[in-house]
Amino acid sequence: AGGGKADTVNGDGILVLDRNGKKVWQWSVFDVCDPFADAELEKHKKDWMHANSLSFDVDSNYLLSFYNLGQVWKIDAHSGRVLWKLGKGGTLRMPAADVFSQSHAVHIDPAGSLMLFDNGVGRKQSGVFAYRIDTAARSAAVDWHINLPAEIYNDRMGSAYTIDDSLVLCCCSKRHITVLVNKKGEIVWTLDTAIPPYRVEFIPAALLKPYILD
């Protein structure tokens, strides 16, 4: 792996606190992975796996996205065991053409699919994937997929969330742009910003109404 005795490997974890700030549960990548088994550890030691999103699956276990690995892990919220790994070199079978290339904003969408913003680093084109996970078959299949226009390719950061059955709100952070697209990837609305937004989420008007002054 390289390096010396004084080197530090920075990893990621999950910390659960109660409302009083007391630790309830803790998990670390070092509990389940040996950094010295990574042949490229010297290259990534300052940010070994780069976790960038944490959310709940429908069964209340954790979904954790690792940018540097190009994977999403499902982690048992009680034992800390890694239940499966989705993505490049993962434990769930899927066609090579359906594998995302680095991801952000992993979550379960309203239809129950695992949805993520695909940075598309390998293809130099970003997009959105929604997968159906078959835990019994240890496989993943694409529910739907959108390719965003090549001119707003976004290799870092970003997010994607459905607004309804036909529209998806996508944030291309490094391009300083948020777009509303249909399931064909066609842009129907655009918001340009002076700063790079890390993530953009849709808030229904009903939730905003109490805070809007007439």
PLM regions and their residue ranges:
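Histidine-/acidic-rich catalytic cores in large beta-rich domains
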Residues: 1-214
